[in-house]
Amino acid sequence: MLDTAGKAEAHAPPRARAWRGLDAVIGNRIALAGLVIIAGQIAAAALAPLLLSHAPDAIDYRAMLQGPSEAHLLGTDELGRDILSRLLSGARLSLSVSTMAVTLAVVLGLPLGLVSGYLGGWPDEILMRLLDSLMALPPLVLALTIAAVLGPGLFNAMIAIAIVSVPTFTRLVRGQVLSLKHNDYVTAAYSVGTPTWRVLFRHILPNAMNPVIVQATLGIGFAIITESSLSFIGLGAQPPTSTWGSMVQVGFQYLELAPWYVMAPAAMMFLAVLGFNMLADGLHDALDPLARTG
């Protein structure tokens, strides 16, 4: 009974599934808490120029490494710049770069997974072996290697993160296509003369998107950590650009004198990753019909 209900919901129109999924996310406390954390960080970063009186790059040598005060709520850095302003400025970059990296990985991984899963045979075998070779190294080590080859810079870090993430989405979509391409509604579409490209993008891809959405949400959290790690070792954001990772990298040198310098961006990274993981957990429950009906 439950299995039948789950299958019926899985084959429901995408728009109907989206609305039911949204209702389920709102009703899931963990997912809602994650969404609130993420929305709060995005809102704070977007409104920072309107709410804060200090520019992120404004230097004041008379206020170097000052602790939190009324004038500087989170203190100042080694050049007297307001840490709160730089923290929120860095939030815009860290969140946007991570989101764009995952978006690029999805854009590249979706068609590769579709073609690989649909064609099968030697094209699928060759692609899977190539992806296996990429996944042989730990993701962070592979991202570091690619970023080192491309050179330091935020754009190159984004490309490195995207390349590392592509195999995950390709294999995920491929697995979904393999399980969906022999379903009755796909066979029925072929029987009435529907072109292959339309079957793929109209009947198979929409039904394969739920795990992709969950993985993309998790992937943003991974991208934040990876971008911060690359910036920490000098392969990401370059001065005077501030991201959470670059702030931790510089602040680590003043850990004993100004512990707040490191704690603020580290806390923001922790909250962001926690928020995306909580949201992904809730999305999994919301978008998986078998999980919800069970």
Predicted region positions:
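Gly/Trp-centered helix-boundary motif
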Residues: 1-110, 114-115, 121-122, 193, ...
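Amphipathic cytosolic juxtamembrane alpha-helices at the membrane-cytosol interface
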Residues: 19, 81-96, 100, 120-128, ...
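Amphipathic alpha-helical segments that mediate coupling or scaffolding at interfaces
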Residues: 24-25, 64, 86-90, 94, ...
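Internal alpha-helical transmembrane segments of multi-pass membrane proteins, especially GPCRs
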Residues: 35, 92, 96-100, 142, ...
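Transmembrane alpha-helix boundary and packing residues in multipass membrane permease domains
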Residues: 41, 114, 143-148, 157, ...
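Short helix-capping/hinge motifs at transmembrane helix termini and TM-loop junctions
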Residues: 48-56, 117-121, 146-152, 164, ...
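Generic hydrophobic transmembrane alpha-helix motif, especially the helices
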Residues: 73, 77, 107-109, 114-118, ...
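Glycine-rich helix-loop "coupling/hinge" segments at transmembrane-helix boundaries
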Residues: 135, 146-149, 161, 176-177, ...
